[in-house]
């Protein structure tokens, strides 16, 4: 008898399902612990052994090697690679890279993971040592060339070659093979056996990398991970980190596979050592691969990928085509994914803190699961992200654990102890402990009630239910994000629940999302293993391209596909598939010229019209298309599938259509339990799923249980039993419209305070996604340089998605100012626009649109969207000149205008303001991208309307008075948290005032005295003594100071409090008129937003003695050509580039500073070296840590960086930087850090014809005219040290314990980009 075995080895449990060719024979299901060393060495082998015992009807000793003669195939998923990555237990490996980039992966994209964490905790690199190869290539042409010159190769210059992408590559320096061999031999002699290799531009020119690999193989390295073979895609950093991940993980995976194979007779081979039984492993992309081809890089999401395949192929009907959301809720986290007829892949993700460039299913892990811990913090219910883990686990596990979501479900009657095996307690022989859970909830309830008024006292049931509501909201938000980010309407989806804990939450989450139907498969708790049975064996092949997508290139593209198809076919034929069993999917990875947003476009079934498919997908995801913009093909990809032999089960829709349904017989209920739902406990029938006939209808409230899952059917919901699924239909009645009960309650409900806090924040987040979707500029659409927020009727901030620290306090200043100006003058259909620093703006490129929402004649609330526009005129492209002295030189100024009047967009007025007015300034120009300005402003208006619609829906759900009441309450909650902080600070400082001062490089002084009231925690932040307005551009609008204050308060509280106006309610700010923190209306301010904001932050933190100074700077570098000629007025075509450069962070008590990272008020990413050189005529010669530039101390300050850029053509360059004169200060005996330097390496030709190289310090702020061959070398400041150096202990230097979730797909990408601006 031939058996097919499918195994998912998870973190806690290993699941297995065995099926037979005779489909009348029921499958065998096995569930066992993944780790049980006292009983077995390997859980997967043990699962096979138990299955074979059942199949063969005989006992098989654990010591006996397993005979595979009756096995048709083995298919496995494993967390071995994931766990090694999460726990940092991979192979010791070395990294081989191009000279000048030894710290490239340490710096990464220069952003920090958490913008509100003073002690920056960045994941450590995976390699143990770096070797630099003295070689270099670059791309000869550059994309932004206004003349569009294309180099052709005629053989006259042997250093020019054509790369795999079709681009011309210049070989500047070849590999010195003798020196490399010597270095690699020394490395090998140190004991290294695994290396990762990534050289600059090897995605298109692999020759040097292949040579390194050849020499390494000759030296004797057993594992050589070449980035060009793993994933030949542009972007050095993610490709390099992918190579190091493979070098780190593949030896671990191979050892595991060798151990696995050794458990079988002849090691899964025949007696004559030829290939034996088929054995395949699941890869991160949802495809299977032969056991001997399974590698570390592609194993990271092996288990979760099986779950996606499982739910996709069991829940989606190809005829009905209803898309499905996968909801996989486990113990520590929840995985969210989507399927709409094809697998959705991402090609650059961050997994376990490591950026991976490899095809992975778009799986998004949320820090909420059954084991998520429950907290009462600052008057709010908080779920996670901390987890109780398996040990000690939840309280009910009887191991002295913590209160968790599982405990809440148990207390409320949603889990039945009798349905669980007796595996708990110290001897693992007891049932779940309800009584201990109840006692712990009663303790927590007493703590909560101690801070509540008598009439608002809560029961333990209410507290537990409150945590369930918060957990559900936490999990619902990323599901909204996943669908909306791709332009889908969430309400037309189904929700498919799987995983051990999903059944208790899926109906409530569906209701929250507006989803009407939930599917729960009969194998939902082992769906990842079941997915292995349904999956195909896959071979993915791709290569880079630089083709333009047009008819002239179609034949060339077809030839490239043919070549890739042969390679993919050969891979699958080697694994035993015949040509008739192989199918192919063809893809082009495309983007518009000048953008980074790529879309993976599949070939239409009946044509080669990729262009129309690109238009359709771009329109869906982003809301628009460019008719006349070139479409660039970055990659050509083939996915070849060897088709699975498993027959598909009947679809849900077919069963719903064919079956006749009847109400359940009450006699089938095993018991009746009092289960808590909204409002109280309700008698609810409990049914065993095994006893429910197909075609049965079960009304809620009820529980449906089997051996591995519990499904909650809430009141008004209806469950239907199919052959393969339980289908739950959700009622969507409005519970609060009639009585507005929350508003009538005499006190604030802390549960709904937490719910509303989350929902208000979700409004701001969804506004942001709407803005990103409908905008057209790179700044907004790709860098996500924007903020969206919700305000009450007075203009007070209610919720601001915390992506841009410099916007946190300033947007409320802006809205309050505009509300006052237009008081009584606004009407429905009006939208305001402003960017002026004296009216709540930060700098001119940040334009804010404000929309009021009316009820009758009364404004109920405002929404606002602020976006950074790439250019709004002024004396230099980018509207950020380093030499501006007056505001008018920096571009268009808009004090207060109506952008929309009675629903009509005022386009002519905006053209006048953005284009005509700035051009009247001497040396100035109107906006250089007016069309983008207008389109992005319309996108901002649309985002505001999205916010109004969402709040209107919230009002419909909970009632107007409740929403308005909780808008106020959430501000009061933040106010309370800040007051508690300030009272604690006053006590620490023994009632003394806090004082600090700092200096800008021109000597201008920032003075701050903080006085805290001992009674109520009120505080005065008094900046008296600060220098007068500056004749330059480091003046900071008043709103910037408010942003710095709210940012500092948030990091000092160090907990996730609501960010709103309440944070500033205890604060009185005194800023003298006409000082450079409150300049006049015409003062230049561009440096205030990007430089002075950092120094205000340093000064505040210095007063609190919280942190040594960080680099106090953002190192703004711009260069370009073209624009308006100041002498002739002629506008010449050109380009412009802008970047900010990281430095060192200041040390804090207990923690070293971090090197090469952005701090405080900025968190922008830096352009990848390969993208930089492809787009612009530059060579990045060096980007390394500036060693020992951080201040010494008990805790050392972080080091700055050195960034060396060589120019290949003449350009105009501007630098706007600080801390070139005043050192970043140390604290509590810690030493100051090194100042920064900006060095121009200039090549002058003397009259004699000789070349002289000069090194010129250009100072902190300057404009230089660089010639071809000149370099700019930016050496950024470090961070100050903390504590006396004599007390340093080297064992306590770095932050550890960063929480990494296993899968970070689309949602994480959006959050990362937006948190890095």
Swiss-Prot record:
One of its GO terms (cellular component) is cytosol. GO terms for molecular function: 5-oxoprolinase (ATP-hydrolyzing) activity. GO terms for biological process: cellular detoxification; glutathione metabolic process. InterPro entries: ACX-like_C, Hydant_A_N, Hydantoinase_A, Hydantoinase_B, Oxoprolinase-like. Belongs to the oxoprolinase family. This is Uncharacterized protein C11D3.15.
